[in-house]
């Protein structure tokens, strides 16, 4: 096990794919992310299988669709009925697989998959955000620490980072580690960020964020209805500050790895549970930022960067920017693959893309991305996107080449009907092949309630 690679997986909340310097944002300061991308592999077409917190996290941790693991919306951890359910009870997670392979495991930051104060199966060390939602960005705040609550002062990002660093310093040097770190600063409320950082962005032009867009296919919801819309420039300054704060925190852990002599044997993966709109399409939020639920690009795209500390001695030309479609389900299998751990015998949707990390091609890699959110399902190709809402719509088809801002729904156009029918058949064939009928998003009204605001019960 001495030569097995360490794995450091960052799963940030609400970090939009567009919100990085290395992804083309001209004003955001993200030197750590830019360094990882410059010395690693960035995926320009990385997606979430479902654009909302808890189920997206479940997808990455289990490698399974929401319609397989059965978690379809964000969990209201303050609700005793919701918190009493073992949502991933019958699933096998990355942590369980790495622990069984002899790895020392730790989770730090946001978990949001139920019973957050207790260490989830597979984790040796546990430091999670507590159940006091909404979460402020600065304490005092309750954390779940190895089965008990502990209230700590200070900024949440700082506390997550320091406990993760303590784990690195105290770990068994004879064993490799697998650790997950979930930063939260980019989540609403978009206020209360570091004043120093927020002030540094208040004079920004925010030219990379579309201005004055409207959403013609539904009404605004959740974050879209709060005070953010009354002062969007300040909200953007706060969001940019949050991204820079997280960038600094990630850099702090990289420095810790380097000081411990572990960076050269560590694989770092940085991603987010889902994307985010900060005025894009007139929306503030993700898939549940509108009613009906949306699948706009900014909601479904996620950042994804792989950095392999061993690459300095490998014949891999860097940096790489890959344009293949990948998602959390693929990333689950790839993380196992790079560590040499076999996945369980389950009906996994994804494929390992380890060869892409080595600048190789993978024959017959898919040219389509599927998604879901409750009774909403999506099929996206490089040219078109179908959003299909069961059982009665409204449904959408977009030509992403001609209409990249997704403003013109062409689903009823006569010349599109062949494409529409082919997409519907492919969408239904995909879910018929993979979904668990007992946990399907098409029967969410019959499944346990996740929160009191589920779109399928309130819209």
Regions found by a protein language model. Name each.
Residues 30, 60, 101, 110, ...:
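Polar, surface-exposed loop/tail segments
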Residues 9-10, 16-106, 117, 125-140:
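Active-site segment of extracytoplasmic enzymes that catalyze sulfate/phosphate-ester chemistry
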Residues 28, 119-122, 129, 191-194, ...:
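Histidine-centered active-site microenvironments of extracellular/periplasmic hydrolases
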Residues 296-297, 307-309, 369-412, 447-459:
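C-terminal, low-complexity/hydrophilic appendages and adjacent surface loops
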Residues 71-100, 112-240, 448:
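Formylglycine-dependent
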Residues 1-5, 12, 16-17, 42, ...:
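Long, internal low-complexity/basic segments
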Residues 61, 132-149, 222-230, 251-255, ...:
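Substrate-binding rim/cap in mid-to-C-terminal beta-strand-loop elements of soluble/periplasmic
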Residues 22-24, 41-64, 72, 107-119, ...:
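Short, solvent-exposed turn/loop segments enriched in Gly/Ser/Thr/Pro and often Arg
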């Amino acid at each position: 096990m001495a030569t097995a690679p360490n794995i450091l997986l960052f799963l940030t909340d609400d970090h939009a794919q567009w919100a990085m310097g290395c992804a083309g944002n001209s004003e955001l300061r993200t030197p750590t992310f830019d360094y990882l991308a410059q010395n690693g592999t960035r995926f320009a077409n990385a997606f979430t299988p479902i654009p909302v917190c808890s189920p997206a996290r479940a997808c990455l941790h289990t490698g399974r669709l929401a319609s397989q693991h059965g978690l379809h919306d964000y969990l209201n951890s303050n609700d005793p009925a919701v918190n009493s359910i073992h949502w991933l009870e019958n699933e096998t997670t990355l942590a369980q697989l790495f622990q069984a392979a002899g790895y020392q495991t730790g989770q730090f930051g946001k978990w949001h998959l139920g019973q957050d104060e207790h260490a989830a199966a597979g984790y040796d060390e546990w430091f999670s955000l507590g159940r006091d939602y909404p979460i402020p960005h600065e304490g005092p705040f309750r954390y779940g620490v190895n089965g008990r609550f502990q209230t700590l002062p200070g900024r949440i990002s700082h506390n997550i980072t320091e406990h993760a660093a303590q784990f690195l310093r105290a770990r068994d040097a004879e064993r490799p580690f697998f650790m997950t770190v979930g930063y939260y600063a980019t989540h609403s409320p978009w206020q209360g960020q570091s004043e120093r950082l927020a002030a540094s962005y208040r004079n920004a032009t925010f030219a990379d964020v579309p201005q004055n867009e409207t959403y013609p296919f539904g009404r605004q919801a959740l974050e879209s209805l709060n005070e953010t819309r009354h002062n969007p420039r300040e909200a953007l300054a706060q969001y940019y500050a949050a991204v820079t704060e997280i960038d600094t925190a990630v850099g702090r852990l990289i420095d810790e790895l380097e000081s411990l002599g572990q960076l050269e044997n560590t694989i770092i993966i940085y991603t987010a549970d889902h994307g985010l709109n900060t005025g894009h399409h007139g929306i503030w939020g993700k898939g549940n930022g509108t009613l009906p639920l949306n699948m706009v690009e900014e909601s479904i795209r996620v950042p994804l960067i792989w950095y392999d500390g061993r690459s300095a001695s490998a014949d891999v030309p860097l940096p790489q920017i890959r344009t293949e479609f990948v998602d959390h389900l693929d990333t689950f299998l790839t993380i196992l693959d790079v560590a040499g751990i076999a996945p369980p015998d389950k009906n996994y949707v994804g494929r390992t893309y380890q060869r892409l990390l080595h600048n190789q091609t993978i024959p017959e890699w898919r040219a389509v991305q599927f998604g879901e959110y409750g009774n909403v399902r999506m099929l996206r190709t490089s040219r078109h996107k179908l959003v299909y809402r069961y059982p009665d719509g409204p449904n959408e088809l977009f030509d992403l080449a001609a209409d990249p801002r997704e403003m013109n729904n062409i689903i009823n156009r006569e010349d599109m009907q062949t494409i529409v029918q082919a997409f519907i058949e492919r969408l239904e064939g995909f879910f018929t092949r993979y979904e668990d009928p007992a946990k399907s998003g098409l029967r969410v009204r019959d499944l346990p309630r996740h929160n009191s605001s589920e779109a399928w019960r309130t819209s």
